[in-house]
Amino acid sequence: MLITNLKIENFRNYNKLNLNLNNKINIFYGNNAQGKTNIIESIFLCSIGKSFRTSKDKELVKFDKDFFRIEVQYKKSDRDGKIKIEYSDKKHIFINGIKVKKFSELLGKINIVIFTPDDINILKNGPKMRRRFLDIMISQLRPNYIYCLNMYTKTLEQRNAYLKQIKLEHKSEDLLDLWNQKLYEYGEKIYKYRLEFIEKIKEKINDIHKKVTGGNEEIKIEYISDFSSEENFYMQLKQNQKIDIIRGATSKGIHKDDFIVYLNGKNVNTYGSQGQNRTVVLSLKMSELQVIKDEIGENPILLLDDFMSELDKERRKNFLENIGDTQVFVTCTDKIDIENLNSNIYNVIDGEVFLRKDWKSNGKIWTWIQSRANTSLRRSWSCKKKTWYVHWKCIYKRITSLSIRDCRQLCWWGFGRLLYTYRSYNRAREYNNCVR
């Protein structure tokens, strides 16, 4: 599947953005806090319906604006599709122009695999991140999964509330059986889904990890759950009922599930180095990509947020050369020059995106630099040195993305402008002397 076009309006630090995307590799580079991750976030939002950075949609709206809009055009199984998400007072989702009531209807339309800097800590942090990893993958492939997960969460909250009422208001414990039954009903389905996909990952991850490490390490995954059978689940709830009442929270259930990764027989979480953690997480993500591909019959979209900073130049190139026909979106702080690969390289500056091409052929770059330079020259005329510096600093950022030939052309143009300004300044000074 492919994303062919991305439109953004009033999202994060973007006013308006319209990008026709490459069907292979799209690289967005620039300094920190320029808006690179916001592009990844907008695609993720159109796939999952939620941001991976915040739970509050209001925070996604550009400062001083009251709405945002994202529109993605994509191709899947040789069919064109369009997803639009708008937010003003609340979030509205449109699929092919038709408004949908539940964000769960969005899941599976655009399949993605995302790798963010926080994912490095999947194995180091608590089980919550590992469950989230499974939830994002499964919800894209099994529409009923997100429903079961939401209902389980709702039932869990109700049971916890009743546990507190038993403690404070001395209510009957008999009603807990009702919540226990519902927890089992939804928990059983969630457990089966998770177990199914853990097994699928197990089949893929060892071969993938051997390719990443050169065949030097053996990797295994163990799924840990309180949910093995109906009798066992009820027994654990009964055994921990007194403790649950004291704490006002449910201590057993699929909300406590986890999985452990072993590297050469040792727990990576406990004994793995930082480098080993990185390679294991990379193997997990690539296994996720292969599982989704097997399920839907085509490659999902791969989103890599600041992932390339973890790899040296040679490994970056090798990785991008070996991802097959997957469409990739990469953000990084440095330019990545890839020869003989189908790619678009974009420079992101202050919420503006510039496609890196020959300078002369890209009128947008020329117009932008020219307007910045002319503004700075006018302001330097009025002796606003600070403003002059700020404008030329912006121009310098943009110049760093140009080729040597383009920089040479820009220098000649800039020299001419400065010479013109100097002569104008001298004429003005002579005129002022005459007036005096």
Please report, for each region that a protein language model flagged, where it lies by residue.
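Walker B catalytic acidic pair
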Residues: 305-307
